[in-house]
């Protein structure tokens, strides 16, 4: 009620918490009903103000994850999130899970997948990827990017490793690693914006149970080592609404045309 951030921790303490069916503020311990947004408890008040209310956001649960929709103009969500067999079936298990505070945006992180040239300078590929080897298609909220692995280690493998990336909006991304004999691991990336320049990214890596102790662990180690070099660049880069692109940059323009639907037009000016 006095402007505290319900997601960020306060100094020496924790952030907002779910308490029963309410969200508890870390600043004054007010409780807000999760369905209506109405204040239902103030520990030091005799009477709850009638207008004590915060906005309630559309929420769905998928595979143990709570996903919240935040539309650019306050609109309701126009699509649903997929149900993944890796979540709900018995064949796969979680090998790795982590949450990282980043000074970045969901837009920048997604654009990393189609910024082909940086895989040489930042990640150590020996040759620049060919744009024609990466396919990108979109329909509504969904974007599909498929192409060879961008990891230098993949060049040493005895098989061709293909990354199949599926975006469902900007905050829910799956990456399937195709071509590995006997398994197709899955990486789920979910991103929660905290403000215009900061977010929390959660990485969940699934492998089928038969290979979890071998391929799953190996891929997890290589995956995080491959992402770490991007962090300082994301932290210090600025958003360029109309970048000057060359023919070897990759499908950045196509990615941005798809991503515009999730932002107000003022964000691109």
What kind of feature is each model-predicted range?
Residues 1-87:
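Rieske [2Fe-2S] iron-sulfur-binding domain
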Residues 74-269:
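C-terminal catalytic domain of Rieske-type non-heme iron oxygenases
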């Amino acid at each position: 009620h006095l402007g505290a951030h319900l997601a960020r921790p306060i100094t020496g303490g924790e952030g907002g918490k779910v308490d029963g069916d309410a969200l508890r503020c870390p600043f004054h311990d007010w409780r807000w009903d999760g369905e209506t947004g109405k204040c239902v408890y103030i520990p030091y008040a005799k009477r709850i103000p009638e207008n004590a209310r915060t906005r309630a956001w559309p929420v769905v649960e998928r595979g143990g994850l709570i996903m919240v929709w935040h539309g650019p103009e306050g609109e309701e969500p126009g699509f649903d999130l997929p149900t993944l067999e890796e979540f709900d079936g018995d064949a796969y298990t979680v090998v790795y899970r982590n949450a990282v505070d980043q000074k970045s945006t969901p837009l920048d992180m997604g654009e990393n997948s189609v910024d082909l040239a940086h895989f040489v300078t930042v990640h150590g590929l020996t040759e620049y990827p060919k744009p024609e080897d990466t396919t990108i298609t979109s329909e509504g909220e969904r974007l599909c990017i498929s192409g060879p692995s961008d990891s230098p280690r993949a060049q040493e493998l005895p098989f061709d490793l293909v990354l199949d990336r599926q975006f469902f909006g900007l905050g829910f991304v799956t990456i399937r690693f195709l071509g590995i004999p006997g398994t197709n691991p899955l990486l789920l990336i979910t991103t929660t914006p905290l403000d215009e320049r900061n977010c929390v990214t959660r990485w969940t890596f699934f492998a089928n149970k038969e290979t979890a102790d071998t391929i799953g662990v190996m891929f997890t180690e290589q995956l995080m080592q491959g992402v770490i070099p991007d962090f300082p660049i994301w932290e210090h880069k600025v958003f360029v609404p109309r970048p000057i692109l060359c023919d070897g940059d990759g499908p950045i323009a196509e990615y941005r045309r798809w991503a515009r639907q999730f932002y107000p037009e003022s964000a691109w000016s």
